[in-house]
Amino acid sequence: MLEKVKHIILVLSGKGGVGKSTVSTQLALTLSESKFKVGLLDIDLCGPSVPYLLGLEGHDVHQCEEGWVPVYTNADKNLAVMSIGFLLKNRTDAVIWRGPKKTAMIKQFLEDVAWEDLDYLIIDTPPGTSDEHITVMECLKAVNADGAIIVTTPQEMALEDVRKEVTFCKKTGINIIGIVENMSGFVCPNCTECTNIFSSGGGVALAELAKVPHLGTLPIDPRVGALAGSGKACVKELPDCTTSKILQSIADNISAEKS
């Protein structure tokens, strides 16, 4: 049911634990705060975290004639969400599936969700380059997705995996919108000064090397972390923090390019 979607953006990461799902959810919330109609599709079948991050755990999806009806975050229906997390009885249930079953589920997510008219569909993918990614790329060929945002941390180990992600995108013909460097520095919750507790600048260097845009550098900010599970937009709750400014900049750049 992607014919009602104007723009499709994938969010990728080379490895787990880099904050990809947090970036996906906050980007979706940022776009919805800008009065766009947004969908967020969580295809991380083995680790669906979007329902938790948006405070939607316990919500159910139901069927209509057109397919699955997504869960909406509010009565305005500015943000619609679909995740396998809504289909599991318990959050701790493990999804132990082989490739063909995963492929079938992802195809169903891409073809059988009854999205209303959307300006943007953000697709939160699993880490790495697996069967799920290949299935998504094949399904999106017909609708010409806008591209992918790649999330990394500045450490060399994460950067090595992101290099593979960049190669994967180029080989599959997916446009790279840009790279986001996450968890770069720590913001003191008292004085808000940012200190580099690990290495920094790796995402910037990789973007230059791969000749793709660097979209921004996000620090570790306890105030932003406290929003997890609330479904609240960082740009609304913490408008002056660095993370909000970067997220708004990414959303503005995306909407400016597509207008």
Swiss-Prot record:
Top-rank lineage group of the source organism: Eukaryota
SUPFAM superfamilies: P-loop containing nucleoside triphosphate hydrolases (SSF52540)
Cofactor note: Binds 4 [4Fe-4S] clusters per heterotetramer. Contains two stable clusters in the N-termini of Nubp1 and two labile, bridging clusters between subunits of the Nubp1-Nubp2 heterotetramer.
Binding site for [4Fe-4S] cluster: 188, 191
Annotated keywords: 4Fe-4S, ATP-binding, Cytoplasm, Iron, Iron-sulfur, Metal-binding, Nucleotide-binding
Cofactor(s) named in the record: [4Fe-4S] cluster
Protein name according to UniProt: Cytosolic Fe-S cluster assembly factor Nubp2 homolog
Organism whose genome encodes this protein: Aedes aegypti
Job description of the protein: Component of the cytosolic iron-sulfur (Fe/S) protein assembly (CIA) machinery. Required for maturation of extramitochondrial Fe-S proteins. The Nubp1-Nubp2 heterotetramer forms a Fe-S scaffold complex, mediating the de novo assembly of an Fe-S cluster and its transfer to target apoproteins.
GO biological process assignments: iron-sulfur cluster assembly
Subunit structure: Heterotetramer of 2 Nubp1 and 2 Nubp2 chains.
Lineage: Eukaryota, Metazoa, Ecdysozoa, Arthropoda, Hexapoda
Entry binding sites for ATP: 14-21
Cellular compartments annotated: Cytoplasm
Transmembrane segments: none
Cross-referenced PANTHER family: CYTOSOLIC FE-S CLUSTER ASSEMBLY FACTOR NUBP2 (PTHR23264:SF19), NUCLEOTIDE-BINDING PROTEIN NBP35 YEAST -RELATED (PTHR23264)
GO annotations of cellular component type: cytosol
GO molecular function, one term: 4 iron, 4 sulfur cluster binding
Family assignment from sequence similarity: Belongs to the Mrp/NBP35 ATP-binding proteins family. NUBP2/CFD1 subfamily.
